[in-house]
């Protein structure tokens, strides 16, 4: 499988169509159908014979973890693999590539809201065990019944996450808050 990282604005029409098809099959929506912030997403695609078979994207969000504020976080979404190609390790390979890319890009943290947390935990993602909040202006709103997984991308954040699980907060956004 060949990997490529492409900003949303640089995707070709064919790439957009392939990504939309993959995401619609998996999530019953495509990344562009609902939220304006997805126009600024960065996509990572895995291709076999020039056909996109696996996909993920991330958007930049600022997280607060306990007392550490403004942690630039790669918030990962729309992770999927073509239905006919599942079970071959493509999504795992894609996520390993993504983590490597984000580490080289000096992001301190990656996060996602999983549909299958065991899949991500096998790849080293850590469950957040504390409270979750979103911030809108000066107000904080606790969010319940949401599971967030984190992937520390540097040693400082990794050590901090192993010792602290009190408050995780991010910025308000349209649509799904997490």
Regions picked out by a protein language model, each given a short descriptive name:
Residues 59, 94-98, 129-136:
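Short acidic (Asp/Glu) patches
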Residues 49-50, 84, 152-157:
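Short loop segments at secondary-structure junctions
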Residues 104-108, 114-139:
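Conserved active-site alpha-helix within GNAT-family acetyltransferase domains
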Residues 134-178:
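C-terminal "cap" of GNAT-fold acetyltransferases
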Residues 97-100, 107:
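Short secondary-structure capping micro-motifs at structural edges
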Residues 3-80:
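A conserved beta-strand-loop-helix scaffold within acyl/acetyltransferase catalytic domains
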Residues 85-97:
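Conserved acetyl-CoA pyrophosphate-binding loop and the N-cap/start of the following alpha-helix
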Residues 76-86, 115-116:
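A short, internal acetyl-CoA/4′-phosphopantetheine-binding micro-motif in the GNAT/acyltransferase core
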């Amino acid at each position: 499988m060949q990997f490529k990282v492409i900003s949303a604005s640089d995707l070709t029409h064919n790439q957009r169509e392939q990504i939309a098809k993959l995401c619609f099959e998996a999530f019953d929506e495509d990344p562009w159908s609902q939220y304006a912030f997805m126009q600024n997403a960065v996509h990572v695609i895995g291709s076999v014979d020039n056909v996109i078979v696996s996909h993920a994207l991330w958007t930049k969000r600022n997280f607060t973890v306990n007392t550490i504020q403004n942690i630039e976080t790669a918030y990962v979404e729309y992770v999927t693999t073509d239905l006919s190609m599942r079970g071959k390790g493509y999504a795992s390979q894609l996520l390993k590539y993504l983590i490597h890319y984000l580490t080289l890009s000096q992001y301190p943290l990656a996060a996602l809201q999983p549909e299958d947390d065991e899949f991500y935990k096998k790849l080293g993602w850590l469950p957040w065990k504390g409270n979750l909040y979103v911030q809108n202006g000066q107000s904080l709103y606790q969010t319940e019944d949401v599971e967030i997984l984190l992937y520390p991308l540097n040693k400082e954040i990794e050590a901090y996450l192993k010792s602290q699980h009190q408050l995780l907060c991010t910025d308000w956004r349209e649509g799904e808050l997490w």
